[in-house]
């Protein structure tokens, strides 16, 4: 019996794309990886460099340079290409530049006969995931953005440092836009099963104002990293690898990816970060948390910001 060979096509061999490729090989997530970039020499150099470390990888991963034609039999096409976020520039200011780039990329991929899952990483990710869905014509379940997976991971890490617990035992979500209007879901945050609100109430060492500062630190993390080193790439690459693993291994894992809402959380016709079940088919379902009134208001504001950004670019886009 022939075993299915998992194949990922990576478009964009910049900082994020290269780090993603490195993570895929180090974790043995896929059987085959094709790297595609307008800068052929850079992509070929990455492939050579990655191949030279194959002796240390947990499993064989066929890694090669390719073209859009190689997307035809890929299970996942991960798009990391696009204009970079500059110091002081918000993710949403990147819209104009990256929409033009994406229209060309997606049309080339679809022309190959691709019928898999798009995974979008380029910012502003919620806008570009919506655009990828529109440009591709694929079912919404098979177009996924990295969403707030990294923001949630940042949140869990910072809370783990604050409460002195492993990040794996901190269960907390950041939802909404991957950007300035994202919000924490305090009403469902817990450490080892104990609600954060209860920890604060019972221990004077923990203060809500310090937790609020953690939220600000999460929101501004990318800006701080960009100021220091010019770009963020390791964290987002690891989150992309996590999503890829959930898809290829058919995990039914719940991750805060950017997914299409059609009435859930009171939002409609928008891609936005919410907890969703991710498996081989893409988005298998959306986990609708029971938000408190403040969280509902913040989430709808976040969705509204994204919809207003989309409106000039997609005439048929519905605005509540």
Curated annotation (Swiss-Prot):
Beta-D-fructose 1,6-bisphosphate binds at residues 156, 168-172. Pathway: Fermentation; pyruvate fermentation to lactate; (S)-lactate from pyruvate: step 1/1. It holds the Pfam family Ldh_1_N. It is found in: Cytoplasm. Homotetramer. Belongs to the LDH/MDH superfamily. LDH family. This is L-lactate dehydrogenase. It comes from Bacillus subtilis (strain 168).
């Amino acid at each position: 019996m022939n075993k299915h060979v998992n194949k990922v096509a990576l478009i964009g061999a910049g900082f994020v794309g290269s780090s993603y490729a490195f993570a895929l090989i180090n974790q043995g997530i896929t059987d085959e990886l094709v790297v595609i970039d307008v800068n052929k020499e850079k992509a070929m150099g990455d492939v050579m460099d990655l191949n030279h470390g194959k002796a240390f990888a947990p499993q064989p991963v066929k890694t090669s340079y390719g073209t859009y034609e190689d997307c035809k039999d890929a299970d996942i096409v991960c798009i990391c290409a696009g204009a970079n976020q500059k110091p002081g520039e918000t993710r949403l200011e990147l819209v104009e530049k990256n929409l033009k780039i994406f229209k060309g990329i997606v049309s080339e991929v679809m022309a190959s006969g691709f019928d898999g899952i798009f995974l979008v990483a380029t910012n502003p990710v919620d806008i570009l995931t919506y655009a990828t869905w529109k440009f591709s014509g694929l079912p919404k379940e098979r177009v996924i953005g990295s969403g707030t997976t990294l923001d949630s991971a940042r949140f869990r890490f910072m809370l783990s440092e604050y409460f002195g617990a492993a990040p794996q035992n901190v269960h907390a979500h950041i939802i909404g836009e991957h950007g300035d209007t994202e919000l924490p879901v305090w009403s469902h945050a817990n450490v080892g099963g104990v609600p954060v609100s209860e920890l604060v109430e019972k221990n004077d060492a923990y203060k809500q104002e310090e937790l609020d500062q953690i939220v600000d630190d999460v929101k501004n993390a990318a800006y701080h990293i960009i100021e220091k080193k010019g770009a963020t790439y390791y964290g987002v690459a690891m989150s992309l690898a996590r999503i890829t693993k959930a898809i290829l291994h058919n995990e039914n894992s719940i991750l805060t990816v950017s997914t299409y809402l059609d009435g859930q959380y009171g939002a409609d016709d928008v891609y936005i970060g919410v907890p969703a079940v991710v498996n081989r088919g893409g988005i298998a379902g959306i986990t609708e948390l029971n938000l408190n009134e403040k969280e509902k208001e913040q989430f709808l504001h976040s969705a509204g910001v994204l919809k207003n950004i989309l409106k000039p670019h997609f005439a048929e886009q519905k605005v509540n």
